[in-house]
Protein backbone atom coordinates (compact mmCIF):
# COMPACT_ATOMS: atom_id res chain seq x y z
CA UNK A 1 0.00 0.00 0.00
CA UNK A 2 1.42 3.36 -1.01
CA UNK A 3 1.58 6.18 1.53
CA UNK A 4 -1.14 8.76 0.87
CA UNK A 5 -1.39 12.13 2.60
CA UNK A 6 -4.39 12.92 4.82
CA UNK A 7 -5.64 15.66 2.50
CA UNK A 8 -6.03 13.19 -0.38
CA UNK A 9 -7.86 10.70 1.85
CA UNK A 10 -10.15 13.47 3.14
CA UNK A 11 -10.99 14.55 -0.42
CA UNK A 12 -11.87 10.95 -1.25
CA UNK A 13 -14.01 10.65 1.88
CA UNK A 14 -15.85 13.91 1.14
CA UNK A 15 -16.73 12.96 -2.43
CA UNK A 16 -20.47 12.49 -2.89
CA UNK A 17 -22.76 11.38 -5.72
CA UNK A 18 -26.24 12.63 -6.65
CA UNK A 19 -28.84 12.45 -9.41
CA UNK A 20 -26.50 14.29 -11.81
CA UNK A 21 -23.72 11.71 -11.37
CA UNK A 22 -22.92 9.01 -13.89
CA UNK A 23 -23.23 5.34 -12.98
CA UNK A 24 -22.32 2.16 -14.84
CA UNK A 25 -22.48 -1.60 -14.44
CA UNK A 26 -19.54 -2.60 -12.21
CA UNK A 27 -16.88 -4.63 -14.05
CA UNK A 28 -14.60 -7.49 -13.07
CA UNK A 29 -11.15 -5.90 -13.42
CA UNK A 30 -9.08 -8.14 -11.15
CA UNK A 31 -8.54 -11.10 -13.48
CA UNK A 32 -5.10 -12.28 -12.37
CA UNK A 33 -2.95 -12.01 -9.26
CA UNK A 34 -0.76 -9.28 -10.80
CA UNK A 35 -3.81 -6.95 -10.86
CA UNK A 36 -3.65 -6.78 -7.07
CA UNK A 37 -0.92 -4.12 -7.24
CA UNK A 38 -3.23 -1.78 -9.14
CA UNK A 39 -6.10 -2.56 -6.77
CA UNK A 40 -3.98 -1.69 -3.73
CA UNK A 41 -3.37 1.75 -5.25
CA UNK A 42 -6.94 2.32 -6.41
CA UNK A 43 -9.59 4.71 -5.14
CA UNK A 44 -11.77 1.68 -4.45
CA UNK A 45 -9.24 0.15 -2.05
CA UNK A 46 -8.71 3.35 -0.08
CA UNK A 47 -12.44 4.09 0.00
CA UNK A 48 -13.23 0.65 1.45
CA UNK A 49 -10.37 0.53 3.95
CA UNK A 50 -11.01 4.09 5.14
CA UNK A 51 -14.71 3.27 5.63
CA UNK A 52 -13.86 0.14 7.62
CA UNK A 53 -11.64 2.18 9.93
CA UNK A 54 -14.30 4.85 10.42
CA UNK A 55 -16.86 2.21 11.36
CA UNK A 56 -14.31 0.70 13.72
CA UNK A 57 -13.74 4.03 15.48
CA UNK A 58 -17.51 4.46 15.87
CA UNK A 59 -17.65 1.07 17.66
CA UNK A 60 -15.06 1.75 20.37
CA UNK A 61 -16.44 1.38 23.88
CA UNK A 62 -20.04 0.71 22.85
CA UNK A 63 -21.28 -1.92 25.30
CA UNK A 64 -24.25 -3.24 23.35
CA UNK A 65 -24.75 -3.61 19.60
CA UNK A 66 -28.46 -2.90 20.13
CA UNK A 67 -28.00 0.85 19.63
CA UNK A 68 -30.52 3.50 18.66
CA UNK A 69 -30.71 4.20 14.94
CA UNK A 70 -32.11 6.75 12.53
CA UNK A 71 -34.91 6.34 9.99
CA UNK A 72 -32.13 6.01 7.39
CA UNK A 73 -30.72 2.95 9.13
CA UNK A 74 -34.23 1.62 9.78
CA UNK A 75 -34.60 1.27 6.01
CA UNK A 76 -31.50 -0.92 5.97
CA UNK A 77 -33.01 -3.09 8.69
CA UNK A 78 -36.14 -3.48 6.57
CA UNK A 79 -34.02 -4.49 3.57
CA UNK A 80 -32.26 -7.21 5.56
CA UNK A 81 -35.57 -8.43 6.96
CA UNK A 82 -36.88 -8.79 3.40
CA UNK A 83 -33.81 -10.85 2.51
CA UNK A 84 -34.35 -13.02 5.57
CA UNK A 85 -37.96 -13.65 4.57
CA UNK A 86 -36.83 -15.33 1.34
CA UNK A 87 -35.23 -18.14 3.34
CA UNK A 88 -38.64 -19.07 4.75
CA UNK A 89 -39.93 -19.68 1.21
CA UNK A 90 -37.05 -21.93 0.06
CA UNK A 91 -36.64 -25.09 2.14
CA UNK A 92 -33.38 -27.02 1.73
CA UNK A 93 -33.46 -29.83 -0.82
CA UNK A 94 -33.82 -33.29 0.65
CA UNK A 95 -31.19 -35.98 0.27
CA UNK A 96 -27.42 -36.05 0.68
CA UNK A 97 -25.37 -33.39 -1.09
CA UNK A 98 -21.60 -33.36 -1.18
CA UNK A 99 -21.03 -29.60 -1.42
CA UNK A 100 -23.77 -27.45 0.07
CA UNK A 101 -27.49 -27.64 -0.55
CA UNK A 102 -28.57 -26.87 -4.15
CA UNK A 103 -31.74 -25.12 -2.93
CA UNK A 104 -29.45 -22.14 -2.29
CA UNK A 105 -29.43 -21.55 -6.05
CA UNK A 106 -33.22 -21.17 -5.95
CA UNK A 107 -32.85 -18.84 -2.96
CA UNK A 108 -30.40 -16.65 -4.88
CA UNK A 109 -32.65 -16.59 -7.94
CA UNK A 110 -35.50 -15.31 -5.76
CA UNK A 111 -33.18 -12.66 -4.31
CA UNK A 112 -32.17 -11.51 -7.81
CA UNK A 113 -35.80 -11.35 -8.92
CA UNK A 114 -36.83 -9.14 -5.98
CA UNK A 115 -33.59 -7.17 -5.44
CA UNK A 116 -34.55 -4.08 -7.44
CA UNK A 117 -37.87 -3.82 -5.61
CA UNK A 118 -36.12 -4.32 -2.25
CA UNK A 119 -33.73 -1.48 -3.15
CA UNK A 120 -36.72 0.85 -3.51
CA UNK A 121 -37.00 0.80 0.30
CA UNK A 122 -33.96 3.06 0.54
CA UNK A 123 -33.24 4.41 -2.97
CA UNK A 124 -35.49 7.30 -4.06
CA UNK A 125 -36.63 7.66 -7.68
CA UNK A 126 -34.19 10.54 -8.16
CA UNK A 127 -31.27 8.15 -7.58
CA UNK A 128 -32.66 5.13 -9.42
CA UNK A 129 -29.75 5.30 -11.89
CA UNK A 130 -27.43 4.29 -9.04
CA UNK A 131 -29.17 0.92 -8.72
CA UNK A 132 -27.00 -0.51 -11.48
CA UNK A 133 -23.99 -0.22 -9.18
CA UNK A 134 -25.59 -0.86 -5.80
CA UNK A 135 -27.35 -4.03 -6.94
CA UNK A 136 -24.03 -5.62 -7.88
CA UNK A 137 -22.68 -5.22 -4.34
CA UNK A 138 -26.00 -6.11 -2.72
CA UNK A 139 -26.35 -9.38 -4.64
CA UNK A 140 -22.71 -10.17 -3.94
CA UNK A 141 -23.29 -9.84 -0.18
CA UNK A 142 -25.10 -13.14 0.34
CA UNK A 143 -22.87 -15.89 -0.95
CA UNK A 144 -22.29 -17.40 -4.39
CA UNK A 145 -25.08 -19.46 -5.93
CA UNK A 146 -22.85 -21.49 -8.24
CA UNK A 147 -20.26 -22.49 -5.67
CA UNK A 148 -22.85 -22.58 -2.84
CA UNK A 149 -20.41 -20.84 -0.54
CA UNK A 150 -20.03 -17.77 1.67
CA UNK A 151 -16.96 -15.95 2.93
CA UNK A 152 -15.09 -12.72 3.52
CA UNK A 153 -15.48 -11.64 -0.11
CA UNK A 154 -19.23 -11.49 0.40
CA UNK A 155 -18.77 -9.48 3.60
CA UNK A 156 -16.60 -7.15 1.49
CA UNK A 157 -19.42 -6.68 -1.00
CA UNK A 158 -21.80 -5.81 1.84
CA UNK A 159 -19.30 -3.21 3.04
CA UNK A 160 -19.28 -1.86 -0.53
CA UNK A 161 -23.07 -1.75 -0.64
CA UNK A 162 -23.27 0.23 2.62
CA UNK A 163 -20.51 2.61 1.56
CA UNK A 164 -22.30 3.12 -1.75
CA UNK A 165 -25.42 4.26 0.12
CA UNK A 166 -23.21 6.57 2.16
CA UNK A 167 -21.69 8.08 -1.00
CA UNK A 168 -25.19 8.77 -2.29
CA UNK A 169 -26.10 10.68 0.88
CA UNK A 170 -28.62 8.00 1.90
CA UNK A 171 -26.65 7.40 5.09
CA UNK A 172 -24.71 9.79 7.28
CA UNK A 173 -21.60 9.75 9.46
CA UNK A 174 -23.97 9.96 12.43
CA UNK A 175 -25.18 6.49 11.40
CA UNK A 176 -21.75 4.83 11.52
CA UNK A 177 -22.15 3.43 15.04
CA UNK A 178 -25.49 1.83 14.20
CA UNK A 179 -24.14 0.53 10.89
CA UNK A 180 -21.02 -1.01 12.44
CA UNK A 181 -22.89 -2.62 15.30
CA UNK A 182 -26.61 -3.15 14.78
CA UNK A 183 -26.64 -3.49 10.99
CA UNK A 184 -23.66 -5.85 11.16
CA UNK A 185 -25.56 -7.87 13.78
CA UNK A 186 -28.68 -8.13 11.60
CA UNK A 187 -26.61 -8.95 8.50
CA UNK A 188 -24.81 -11.71 10.42
CA UNK A 189 -28.13 -13.16 11.57
CA UNK A 190 -29.29 -13.36 7.94
CA UNK A 191 -26.03 -14.90 6.71
CA UNK A 192 -25.70 -17.38 9.57
CA UNK A 193 -29.16 -18.67 8.77
CA UNK A 194 -28.09 -19.11 5.14
CA UNK A 195 -24.93 -20.96 6.20
CA UNK A 196 -26.88 -23.31 8.44
CA UNK A 197 -29.93 -23.82 6.21
CA UNK A 198 -28.05 -24.46 2.97
CA UNK A 199 -24.77 -25.69 4.49
CA UNK A 200 -22.77 -23.06 2.61
CA UNK A 201 -19.13 -23.97 2.06
CA UNK A 202 -16.42 -21.60 3.36
CA UNK A 203 -15.35 -19.37 0.45
CA UNK A 204 -11.59 -18.98 0.06
CA UNK A 205 -11.02 -20.64 3.42
CA UNK A 206 -7.55 -21.20 4.86
CA UNK A 207 -8.93 -24.18 6.75
CA UNK A 208 -8.14 -24.13 10.45
CA UNK A 209 -5.47 -21.49 9.76
CA UNK A 210 -8.04 -18.89 8.84
CA UNK A 211 -9.58 -16.62 11.46
CA UNK A 212 -13.08 -18.00 10.81
CA UNK A 213 -14.60 -20.16 8.07
CA UNK A 214 -17.09 -17.52 6.94
CA UNK A 215 -16.74 -14.18 8.76
CA UNK A 216 -14.18 -11.54 9.73
CA UNK A 217 -15.83 -8.15 10.26
CA UNK A 218 -17.65 -9.00 13.54
CA UNK A 219 -14.29 -9.68 15.16
CA UNK A 220 -13.06 -6.21 14.22
CA UNK A 221 -16.08 -4.26 15.44
CA UNK A 222 -16.63 -6.57 18.41
CA UNK A 223 -13.06 -6.10 19.63
CA UNK A 224 -13.51 -2.34 19.15
CA UNK A 225 -16.51 -2.48 21.49
CA UNK A 226 -14.12 -3.66 24.22
CA UNK A 227 -11.11 -1.55 23.24
CA UNK A 228 -11.75 1.25 25.73
CA UNK A 229 -9.95 1.14 29.07
CA UNK A 230 -13.08 0.54 31.15
CA UNK A 231 -14.15 -2.53 29.17
CA UNK A 232 -10.62 -3.95 28.95
CA UNK A 233 -10.32 -3.94 32.72
CA UNK A 234 -13.54 -5.97 33.13
CA UNK A 235 -13.21 -8.67 30.49
CA UNK A 236 -10.06 -10.07 28.84
CA UNK A 237 -9.56 -11.67 25.41
CA UNK A 238 -9.18 -15.13 26.96
CA UNK A 239 -12.79 -14.93 28.18
CA UNK A 240 -13.86 -16.44 24.84
CA UNK A 241 -12.71 -19.82 26.24
CA UNK A 242 -15.41 -19.64 28.91
CA UNK A 243 -18.67 -20.85 27.33
CA UNK A 244 -20.84 -19.24 30.01
CA UNK A 245 -19.28 -15.81 29.40
CA UNK A 246 -19.53 -16.31 25.62
CA UNK A 247 -23.24 -17.11 25.81
CA UNK A 248 -23.85 -14.08 28.02
CA UNK A 249 -21.78 -11.57 26.01
CA UNK A 250 -23.01 -12.84 22.63
CA UNK A 251 -26.23 -10.87 23.18
CA UNK A 252 -24.38 -7.56 23.22
CA UNK A 253 -20.92 -7.98 21.65
CA UNK A 254 -20.18 -8.94 18.04
CA UNK A 255 -16.89 -10.71 18.85
CA UNK A 256 -18.52 -13.00 21.38
CA UNK A 257 -21.52 -13.48 19.08
CA UNK A 258 -19.12 -14.75 16.40
CA UNK A 259 -17.44 -17.09 18.91
CA UNK A 260 -20.84 -18.46 19.96
CA UNK A 261 -21.61 -19.29 16.33
CA UNK A 262 -18.31 -21.16 16.04
CA UNK A 263 -19.21 -23.12 19.18
CA UNK A 264 -22.49 -24.10 17.53
CA UNK A 265 -20.92 -25.07 14.21
CA UNK A 266 -17.76 -26.85 15.35
CA UNK A 267 -16.97 -29.68 17.70
CA UNK A 268 -13.81 -30.59 19.56
CA UNK A 269 -11.20 -28.50 21.42
CA UNK A 270 -11.30 -24.80 20.52
CA UNK A 271 -7.52 -24.64 20.06
CA UNK A 272 -7.75 -27.36 17.39
CA UNK A 273 -10.58 -26.03 15.21
CA UNK A 274 -9.83 -22.29 15.69
CA UNK A 275 -6.08 -21.94 16.40
CA UNK A 276 -5.81 -18.31 15.26
CA UNK A 277 -8.62 -17.17 17.54
CA UNK A 278 -7.12 -19.29 20.30
CA UNK A 279 -3.74 -17.57 19.85
CA UNK A 280 -5.45 -14.17 20.14
CA UNK A 281 -6.52 -15.08 23.69
CA UNK A 282 -2.88 -14.55 24.73
CA UNK A 283 -3.05 -10.85 23.76
CA UNK A 284 -3.45 -8.91 27.04
CA UNK A 285 -5.73 -6.04 25.96
CA UNK A 286 -8.53 -5.59 23.47
CA UNK A 287 -7.09 -2.47 21.85
CA UNK A 288 -4.13 -4.55 20.64
CA UNK A 289 -6.50 -7.28 19.45
CA UNK A 290 -8.45 -4.67 17.50
CA UNK A 291 -5.37 -3.09 15.93
CA UNK A 292 -4.06 -6.51 14.96
CA UNK A 293 -7.34 -7.56 13.37
CA UNK A 294 -7.50 -4.44 11.20
CA UNK A 295 -3.98 -5.15 9.95
CA UNK A 296 -4.93 -8.79 9.43
CA UNK A 297 -8.01 -7.77 7.41
CA UNK A 298 -5.82 -5.65 5.17
CA UNK A 299 -3.43 -8.57 4.62
CA UNK A 300 -5.79 -11.56 4.56
CA UNK A 301 -8.80 -10.01 2.82
CA UNK A 302 -7.90 -6.82 0.94
CA UNK A 303 -4.55 -8.19 -0.24
CA UNK A 304 -5.68 -11.66 -1.28
CA UNK A 305 -6.47 -12.29 -4.95
CA UNK A 306 -8.87 -15.24 -4.29
CA UNK A 307 -11.02 -12.88 -2.17
CA UNK A 308 -10.85 -9.56 -4.00
CA UNK A 309 -11.14 -10.99 -7.53
CA UNK A 310 -14.91 -11.13 -7.06
CA UNK A 311 -15.23 -7.41 -6.18
CA UNK A 312 -16.33 -5.32 -9.16
CA UNK A 313 -15.57 -1.71 -10.07
CA UNK A 314 -17.75 1.14 -11.30
CA UNK A 315 -17.92 4.86 -10.53
CA UNK A 316 -18.66 4.45 -6.82
CA UNK A 317 -15.58 2.26 -6.47
CA UNK A 318 -13.16 3.22 -9.27
CA UNK A 319 -10.20 1.02 -10.17
CA UNK A 320 -8.10 4.02 -11.21
CA UNK A 321 -5.27 5.04 -8.84
CA UNK A 322 -5.98 7.42 -5.97
CA UNK A 323 -2.73 9.28 -6.62
CA UNK A 324 -1.96 9.98 -10.27
CA UNK A 325 1.45 8.72 -11.35
Swiss-Prot record:
Keywords: Cytoplasm, Isomerase, Nucleus, Rotamase. The keyword Isomerase applies. InterPro entries: Phstyr_phstse_ac (IPR004327), PTPA_C_lid (IPR043170), PTPA_sf (IPR037218). Its EC number is 5.2.1.8. This is Serine/threonine-protein phosphatase 2A activator 1. Transmembrane segments: none annotated. PPIases accelerate the folding of proteins. It catalyzes the cis-trans isomerization of proline imidic peptide bonds in oligopeptides. Acts as a regulatory subunit for PP2A-like phosphatases modulating their activity or substrate specificity, probably by inducing a conformational change in the catalytic subunit, a direct target of the PPIase. Can reactivate inactive phosphatase PP2A-phosphatase methylesterase complexes (PP2Ai) in presence of ATP and Mg(2+) by dissociating the inactive form from the complex. Its main location: cytoplasm. It comes from the Eukaryota. It is found in: Cytoplasm; Nucleus. It comes from Schizosaccharomyces pombe (strain 972 / ATCC 24843) (Fission yeast).
Amino acid sequence: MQVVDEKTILELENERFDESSQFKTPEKLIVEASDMTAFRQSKAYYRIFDFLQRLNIASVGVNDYHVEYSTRVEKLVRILCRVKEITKTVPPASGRHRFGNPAFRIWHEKLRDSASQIMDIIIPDSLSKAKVELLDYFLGSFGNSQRIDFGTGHELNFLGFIKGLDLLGLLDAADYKAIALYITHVYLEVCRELVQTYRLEPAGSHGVWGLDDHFFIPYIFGSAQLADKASSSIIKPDAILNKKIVDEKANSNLYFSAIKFINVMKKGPFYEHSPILYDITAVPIWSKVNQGLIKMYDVEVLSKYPVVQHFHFGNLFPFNPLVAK
